[in-house]
Amino acid sequence: MNLGGCNDMSQISEYFRSIFFPNLGITLRNIGDHINIGSFEVRFYGIIIMIGFLLAYVLVTNEAKRTKQNPEMYLDFILILIIPAILGARLYYILFRLDQYIVQGDVGATIKAMLNIRGGGLAIYGGIIAGVITAVIFCKVRKVSFVLMADTATFGILIGQILGRFGNFFNREAFGAYTNSKMAMAIPLDYYRSDGNLDYLERTGVITQKMLDNVVNIDGMDCITVHPTFLYESLWNLMLLVFLFIYRKHKKFKGEFALIYVGGYGLGRFIVEGLRSDSLMIGDTGIKVSQALALVCFVIAVVLLVINYVRCAKRGWPAAVMGDAAGTEVKISGECDPADTEVETSGEADAAGTEVETSGGSDDAGEKKKDDKDATK
C-alpha cells in the first residue's frame, strides 16, 4: 500500500484518521476521536455533549426570559437532567443491541460492557424519553406547566442535537449507505482495522457488501464512500431551530413549539434513518426502530397541530401571545390563548392557584359597583 511517503507509524496513523469529501474536493487530515490529558483519555463525543448542554442552557434561559419565566428554574432542571438523559440514551441503545453486550457466564463483564459509554452507543430517542419523564416529575414538584416548559426546552434540545451529531463524525459512526453523490464522505477502511472493529462492522452489516464492492483509493488508502447522515440530520435540525426563532413571536397556543419540533424532527429522522446502515431494528422484522418511532411522532404531532389550529381559528387568533410585564399570561375570552387557562408567574405556579380571565362580561368590581348603586336608590 502506498501511503504517500510516510516513514513512521505516527504519520501512517494520521493518514488513517483522514476523512474525505472527494466530490467536494475537501480533505480533513488527522481527525482523531479523543484527546489525552496526562494518562486520561477524553473522547470528543463526551466533550461535544457537554458543550451541547451548555449551549442548550444559554438558549433555554434566553427563551425563558423572553417569556417572563424564571431562568434559574431551567438551570436546576438541566443539572438534574444530565445523568438521566445519558442513562436513557444508553439503555435505549443497549435494549436493541443486547447481543453486543452480554458476555455469557460473566455478569461482571456484561455490566462493564454496558457501562462503557466512552466508545459510543447512545441513542437520542432514549435521551429524549428519559428527559420527558424527568421533566414531568420536575414540573409536578415545582408546580409549573409541563407544556410551557416543553416549548421552552425545545430550543435547547435542538441545539444539543445539532452539535451532538458531530460526535458521530469524530467516531466515524451513524453514517449511511454507499453513495457516490456530491455529498459522499470517504473513510479509510484501515481506520476501523486499526481499532479492531472492521470484522464486527462487516459482520453486523454496518459496513455493507455494496460499500466494499465500491471501495475507492484516495491517497493510497482504500476508502468506503457513504452518506454523511450525521450531517444531514444536523442540518435538518438547524433549519428547524432557525424556523422556530423566526416564528416564535407568532406562537398560537401553548405546546405549539414542542409539537412543531416533534413533527419536524420526526419527518427528518424518518428520511435520514432510511439511509443509515447501522439502525437499531425491531427484532427480526426488518423494521428500523427509529424510523417507526419517527413516523409515529410525525403523525401524532401533525394531528395535534391541526386540531389546535382549527380550534384557534374558531375562537379567533390571539392578539398577543405574551402576558403583562409581571409575567402573568392573561386569558382573554373568545381568543385562542397560548397559556390555555393557567397563570404562569416567573416560571413558578401562582401561590393562590388562581386563573386570570378578562372578558366582555361583568367582573367582581363591576358587581360591587352595581350593588353600591342599588343601595343608594
Give the residues covered by each predicted segment.
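A feature for loop-to-transmembrane-helix boundaries and adjacent hydrophobic helices
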Residues: N2-K377
